[in-house]
Amino acid sequence: MSSTETYEPLLTRLHSDSQITERSSPEIEEFLRRRGSTVTPRWWLKLAVWESKLLWTLSGASIVVSVLNYMLSFVTVMFTGHLGSLQLAGASIATVGIQGLAYGIMLGMASAVQTVCGQAYGARQYSSMGIICQRAMVLHLAAAVFLTFLYWYSGPILKTMGQSVAIAHEGQIFARGMIPQIYAFALACPMQRFLQAQNIVNPLAYMSLGVFLLHTLLTWLVTNVLDFGLLGAALILSFSWWLLVAVNGMYILMSPNCKETWTGFSTRAFRGIWPYFKLTVASAVMLCLEIWYNQGLVIISGLLSNPTISLDAISICMYYLNWDMQFMLGLSAAISVRVSNELGAGNPRVAMLSVVVVNITTVLISSVLCVIVLVFRVGLSKAFTSDAEVIAAVSDLFPLLAVSIFLNGIQPILSGVAIGSGWQAVVAYVNLVTYYVIGLPIGCVLGFKTSLGVAGIWWGMIAGVILQTLTLIVLTLKTNWTSEVENAAQRVKTSATENQEMANAGV
């Protein structure tokens, strides 16, 4: 990755019999610039194949990482669910309501790493990337300190939110066991985004797979053999996340792939932190408003009559929806890197091509997943519980799950485009209005003022997602990608200048 090498974003030399697929990103950019509106459908198809190969080379491993990270909590809840319906409700409310809030903050803050590091990588400003990652870690650890109090006092908080005493008690036990996990989040999220921005995704996938397999074995031992209950399961979850931090950190420190982007720890990470902090806040608000929206559905469901059944049913549906979300977040991370790399490299037309191809791809995938959910809904319900009443309640909600899965094929991808382009602040306002001013109130009215119950809450929230998705589509269609290249160049230039000034000053 020396400065003398010709830069080509991502994997740009793919072997194919088709001439177009042998071209680099700058060559494709020049082709699109010259041909413009005269590009024929035959050539658009070849361009789509070219982009799809790049996208899947990157997103395949990104999806594995995203899904396996989520599966750590998924497997934990599956094992605790067989301890009893009350334990399942407690673990679910702690995982969704408490851990989900913390993870939303950490993941949202880390999306700023994707924006700045991705654009810096595209512009070949490699030395600034390690400093950006360290700044992110500092801010994440500071946030983790404040979140610790949320975990420790989760019982009273859950009761204040209307959860029953029994569910709040079980949830507090589980949440306190996850306190070490918060600090693991604070380090793992920036490190993974730092590696993804450099297109280092296969090693991340291997590390995540190894940790997941060990986690599954340890969780089974703790819950089924040693009978350590909820607390034991939560502590194993925390341990697994720290193991993930350890292997990710060792890779960054020891791998030759990071020798130009990670030049060691530096006090420069503490300087010039304010501009990055502002982007971090916008990123956190944007993604948190999305993640908490679904978590709110679970929490509000606990306020209905017969809360244990309602909470178990919606929690199981949310776990499947979140599994699908992790799949789409893997694609979202890939498109974020694609867009940020291409904007940083000055290829606006290739960035736009990436956006179109990934959206067509995800809509097709979501359509297939909808059919699978509807056909196998009873079997999928039994994976979590043997309670006949809960199974029936879950099966009744699966049509709504199918609708949400289809929307997942569009909304997270457009959010990934926003992250790659640095639009976090704008999307944060969109999320606030469509989700919390419109969708959530409609859901509460339908859930509590009609006989629809939890289905009514979900329908209202689906309305919010539809409005948000339509807004993002309009925003994307109206984007001037040439201007976005200029914005990316200015963002990278500012970061690089700050780092160079501090280096010259001996900081």
Swiss-Prot record:
Domain of life: Eukaryota
Induction conditions: Positively regulated by the TT2-TT8-TTG1 complex.
Claim: Transport is one of the keywords in the record: yes
GO cellular component: plant-type vacuole membrane
One family name in Pfam for this protein: MatE
GO MF term list: polyspecific organic cation:proton antiporter activity; transmembrane transporter activity; xenobiotic transmembrane transporter activity
Mode of membrane association: Multi-pass membrane protein
Cytoplasmic side: 1-62, 114-137, 192-202, 246-283, 334-355, 411-425, 475-507
UniProt cross-references to InterPro entries, sorted A to Z: MATE_euk, MATE_fam
UniProt keyword Ribonucleoprotein present: no
Gene null: resulting phenotype: Pale brown seeds due to a strong reduction of proanthocyanidin deposition in vacuoles of endothelial cells.
Tissues expressing the protein: Expressed in reproductive tissues, from buds to siliques. Restricted to the endothelium layer of the ovule and the seed coat.
Topological domains annotated Vacuolar: 84-92, 159-170, 224, 305-312, 377-389, 447-453
Bilayer-crossing regions: 63-83, 93-113, 138-158, 171-191, 203-223, 225-245, 284-304, 313-333, 356-376, 390-410, 426-446, 454-474
Gene Ontology BP annotations: flavonoid biosynthetic process; maintenance of seed dormancy; proanthocyanidin biosynthetic process; xenobiotic detoxification by transmembrane export across the plasma membrane
Subcellular location: Vacuole membrane
Pathway: Secondary metabolite biosynthesis; flavonoid biosynthesis
Annotated keywords: Antiport, Flavonoid biosynthesis, Membrane, Transmembrane, Transmembrane helix, Transport, Vacuole
NCBIfam families given in the database record: matE
PANTHER family reported in the protein's UniProt record: MULTIDRUG RESISTANCE PROTEIN
Protein function: Acts as a flavonoid/H(+)-antiporter that control the vacuolar sequestration of flavonoids in the seed coat endothelium. Could transport the anthocyanin cyanidin-3-O-glucoside and epicatechin 3'-O-glucoside in vitro.
Family indicated by similarity: Belongs to the multi antimicrobial extrusion (MATE) (TC 2.A.66.1) family.
Protein name: Protein DETOXIFICATION 41
Organism: Arabidopsis thaliana
Taxonomic lineage: Eukaryota, Viridiplantae, Streptophyta, Embryophyta, Tracheophyta
Gene name, Swiss-Prot/TrEMBL: DTX41
